[in-house]
């Protein structure tokens, strides 16, 4: 029986490269046994609505072709449904944080090959109030860099554009009094920014969460406390090497649920796009979405449960089984 695939793509992403390559993508998927159709988004929110429609038509897989914003919209269209289809990703944005985290090929046909191989990984997603995200949520002036960086600069220098814009914004940064409740702990004080990460890659920084796991049911919470300009510049430099977590002005924690509030207005960034303002409640939805990934995805980025499921390692016996085996051997 042929499987049904629905491609939801942003025709303007990647200088319209996917739009021009679409006929070849459709042929390749058809030859691999997929009955495939495609939908081009026209405005903000289109990908979410189309993903919801695709669910009603019982597609086996939804393929998001575009940048992190398109992917976020597709995830929001399927996250609330109990029977979610598999998610395929063809990264077409400038940075493609989530695609980088999954080590997806940067070329279109390579990404299609990953989908055809049909190896999947169940990954965590986050819920912020009534919307979902798949990579990060953040607050603070510096977190606005992803949607304030000019498109022309991104097209010229790629992810390095965020570094340039980030250093440009440092002198404007002001600390805000925040209350952050996470699991059984509380941070109360002045902070310049906070980040909730689900993967290791955010705004081009691939080592921002050096110990990230895609499926452990926890956010990585990073809080940068009030600091001077020199300290901030040092933290940004350290972040490019994954060494910022040792800085005395950086709080680095793991948490399943987080509540953040402030008496001062603070904008939120969700998967690289404007996400409203505080207050916000965050909840990690463990292994909520099944995503097509390369077969050689790094094992250290997955929990033991996923590695057992993939056949990478054998399941460890329970304490009861160990005791029973010992009794038999005696």
From Swiss-Prot:
Residues at the active site: 273 (proton acceptor)
One of the protein's GO biological processes: phospholipid biosynthetic process
Binding site for ATP: 10-14, 41, 67-73, 94
Cited PROSITE patterns: DAGK (PS50146)
Family annotation (InterPro entries): ATP-NAD_kinase_N, Diacylglycerol/lipid_kinase, Diacylglycerol_kinase_cat_dom, Lipid_Phosphate_FormReg, NAD/diacylglycerol_kinase_sf, YegS/DAGK_C
Pfam families to which the protein is assigned, alphabetical: DAGK_cat, YegS_C
Catalyses which reaction(s): a 1,2-diacyl-sn-glycerol + ATP = a 1,2-diacyl-sn-glycero-3-phosphate + ADP + H(+)
Domain DAGKc: from-to ranges: 1-132
EC number: 2.7.1.107
Sites where the protein binds Mg(2+): 213, 216, 218
Top-rank taxon: Bacteria
Keyword Transferase: yes
UniProt keyword annotations, A-Z: ATP-binding, Kinase, Lipid biosynthesis, Lipid metabolism, Magnesium, Metal-binding, Nucleotide-binding, Phospholipid biosynthesis, Phospholipid metabolism, Transferase
Record-level Gene Ontology MF annotations: ATP binding; ATP-dependent diacylglycerol kinase activity; metal ion binding
Key word ATP-binding present: yes
UniProt cofactor(s): Mg(2+)
Cysteine disulfide partners in this protein: none
Record-level GO cellular component terms: plasma membrane
NCBIfam families: PRK13055.1, PRK13337.1, YegS/Rv2252/BmrU family lipid kinase
Subunit field text: Homodimer.
Family in the record: Belongs to the diacylglycerol/lipid kinase family.
Protein purpose: Catalyzes the phosphorylation of diacylglycerol (DAG) into phosphatidic acid. Is a key enzyme involved in the production of lipoteichoic acid by reintroducing DAG formed from the breakdown of membrane phospholipids into the phosphatidylglycerol biosynthetic pathway.
Protein name: Diacylglycerol kinase
Lineage summary: Bacteria, Bacillati, Bacillota, Bacilli, Bacillales
């Amino acid at each position: 029986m042929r499987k049904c695939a629905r491609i939801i793509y942003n025709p303007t992403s990647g200088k319209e490269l996917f739009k021009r390559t679409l006929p070849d993508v459709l042929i390749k998927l058809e030859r691999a046994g997929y009955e495939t159709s495609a939908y081009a988004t026209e405005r903000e929110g289109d990908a979410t609505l189309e993903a919801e429609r695709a669910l009603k038509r019982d597609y086996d897989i939804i393929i998001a072709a575009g940048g992190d914003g398109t992917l976020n919209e597709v995830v929001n269209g399927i996250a609330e449904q109990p029977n979610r289809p598999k998610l395929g990703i063809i990264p077409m944005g400038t940075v493609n944080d989530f695609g980088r985290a999954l080590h997806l090929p940067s070329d279109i046909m390579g990404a299609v090959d990953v989908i055809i191989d049909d190896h999947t990984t169940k990954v965590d997603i986050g819920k912020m109030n009534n919307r979902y995200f798949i990579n990060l949520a953040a607050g603070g002036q510096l977190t606005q860099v992803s949607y304030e960086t000019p498109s022309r600069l991104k097209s010229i220098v790629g992810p390095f554009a965020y570094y340039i814009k980030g250093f440009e914004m440092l002198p404007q940064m002001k600390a805000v009094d925040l209350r952050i409740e996470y699991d059984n702990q509380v941070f109360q004080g002045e902070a310049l920014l906070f980040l909730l990460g689900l993967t290791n890659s955010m705004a081009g920084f691939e080592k921002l969460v050096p110990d990230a796991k895609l499926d452990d049911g926890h956010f990585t919470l990073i809080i940068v406390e009030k600091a001077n300009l020199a300290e901030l510049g040092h933290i940004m430099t350290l972040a490019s090497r994954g060494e910022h977590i040792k800085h005395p002005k950086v709080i680095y924690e793991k948490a399943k649920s987080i509540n953040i509030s402030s008496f001062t207005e603070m904008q939120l960034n969700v998967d690289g796009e404007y996400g409203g303002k505080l207050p916000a409640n965050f909840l990690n939805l463990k292994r909520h979405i099944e995503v097509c990934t390369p077969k050689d995805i790094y094992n250290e980025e997955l929990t033991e449960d996923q590695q057992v499921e993939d056949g990478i390692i054998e399941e460890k016996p329970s304490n009861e089984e160990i005791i029973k085996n010992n009794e038999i051997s005696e």
